[in-house]
Amino acid sequence: SRGLGDVYKRQELAPSGMNWGVGTWGENRQMMDILRRRIVADPDGVRNVIKQCHLTEHHMLVGGSSFKRLEVPAGVPDDLKGWYALREVYISPESTASVDVHSPQLTKRVQEDFLSLSPLYHLLRGAYEAIPPEEVDKMVQKMRR
């Protein structure tokens, strides 16, 4: 793992296409473990952050590889199980094919998308410091009983 510096805001513009979004740069086990602890400790808080981003309204996709056999604690709500199992995460537009690179609308759309993703970026960026690991580990053990 490269550490928490792997959380990014990204925009790419190339002759072959363009894209933008937020997420982790490759697999970051330490940060994702911390996010998993946060999901267990405060599922409503994590859900609220995700809802604040209006991913569907902004036509954003959540991507990333997942652990196939990771045991998800019984208390994790169904709508967060996919997030819990992620090895890495990135959120980007469904499609940018119809966006004209020379259009003033591009700047507006990228700005709006980054503003909408801000709560999720801050959740990922602050995952390590959000909850003391000792407290969360106790909660996880309690849920497994």
Task: Please give the residue ranges for each predicted region.
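Charged, low-complexity intrinsically disordered regions
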Residues: L13-R145
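Short, small-residue-biased leader/transition segments that mark boundaries at the very start
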Residues: G3-Y8
